[in-house]
Amino acid sequence: MQNKTDKLGFWSIVLLAINSIIGSGIFLTPGSVVAMAGTKAPLVYLIAAIFAAMLALTFAAAAKYVTKSGAAYSYAKAAYGENMGFYMGVVRFFSASVAWGVMGVGVIKSTLSIFGADSTSFKNITWGFVVLMAIILLINFFGQRFLTWVSNLATIGKLLALGLIIVAGVIVFLKTGVNHFHDLDTLKAANGQPLIPKLTTSGLVMAVIAAFYAFTGFESVASGSEDMKDPQKNLPRAIPLAIMVIALVYIGTILVAMAINPAAIVKTKQVVAITAIFQARWLRILIELGALISMFGINVAASFHTPRVLEAMAKEHQAPQWLAKRTRHDFPVYPFMITLALAIFIPMAFQYNMTAIIVLSAMVRFFEFIVIPLGVIRFYRGANVEPVLTAERNWLTDVLLPVLSVAFTIFLLFKFDWVGEFGISTAQGIVPNWFAIIGMAIGFVILPAGLFMMLRHEKS
């Protein structure tokens, strides 16, 4: 039995949420958002933050009705019944497992590049991948208290690194007195055309989606709610607070980058793109180390969330019962090992080609962002299929915000570049991206159908 003192308190939940959300995105990919949106990039991040905050408050509202581990799985099961819960649990577990693998590959490739090794070598990536996962296994094996300590340390490290970018940028700006924010308007490509295209509605939507990916992760925080103190009280307060802190840090980082050297962040080929805005080598090294800490931290967070989805399904008798057993250190070892196997072997089977896996993970999130808000409305109306906790009902968080979240999600899906994501441009035209198509089929159809038949056979 786990002591309550070993469980995550309010501030540890806040730090876990920050650790789950801030990963490699803000360090590696702000250039793509700036390249799409130009001087409107801070506005894009603000819109993405508002959307993330709406969804975070909606998921937090679900957490006050359902405090079982499993997050989206448990919410869907309570709102719609066993079948929807099972489907949500399987696709969420699969995509989260493989997404963890993607994040692991990101850490290894970045580490290899920073230290001058070949980051494209299959052998180098594989060995680095195995070592990283072994370290994370040891961290989890030592129990909840040690994992919490590592997670909190990683969170503080990444916030310090981002804080360093902002402080150093402000100092550079004050020393030079020059604001390069509008230099983007005059940048030219090699063909003489403007480097930043004119912003259209479709372009704005794709930029918001790209920026929004930097905020994803909040939906997984409640996966381990049974390992938290008073989750029904702490989760609805901790998740929105984490989103607010992250939004301020992200927008501050982008504003600093665009004021100092926006051209560098768009044109750079460096692994940690945000370092391109600075000239000082020592400063770049510090930021690169912060990026590695950030990416390692989000891997630790993923190792906490993801296995608990499968464990939660076992506790609800929708997966084999041996998956619900824990070690004497209160570690769900069997779900963890299955998660670890998926995280290692799926990316390896795709030769570390991440395109299909990233698309799969994104599509499952969009699926969640429609199903769960509608489920919260069912909780509010008392239309849930399974019993939920008696919670204080709030029309703003339980009805209005879920409706707005669903509407915005559908709008993003409508404007989503489906051809670009599921097609590959060649000299002969656009051909199907079979990696992406097969990945979607496995995650949404083959795996759920296979596990459903296995479960029915076991029960019979």
Language-model segments: residues:
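Membrane-interface "cap" regions at the ends of multi-pass membrane proteins
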Residues: 1-31, 35-40, 53, 57, ...
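Helix-loop-helix connectors at the membrane interface of multi-pass transporters/channels
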Residues: 1-2, 77, 104-127, 161-164, ...
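Helix-loop-helix junctions that connect adjacent transmembrane segments
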Residues: 3-6, 41-42, 118-124, 156-284
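Transmembrane helix-loop boundary segments of multi-pass membrane transporters
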Residues: 31-37, 41-42, 114-125, 145-155, ...
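Hydrophobic transmembrane alpha-helices that form the core helical bundles
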Residues: 32-35, 44, 54-133, 137-141, ...
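TM-loop-TM module centered on a large, flexible mid-protein loop between adjacent transmembrane helices
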Residues: 74-75, 81, 113-118, 185-195, ...
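Membrane-interface loop-to-helix entry segments
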Residues: 111, 124-182, 239-244, 361-372, ...
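C-terminal membrane-solvent junction of multi-pass transporters and transport-like membrane proteins
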Residues: 322-331, 369-437
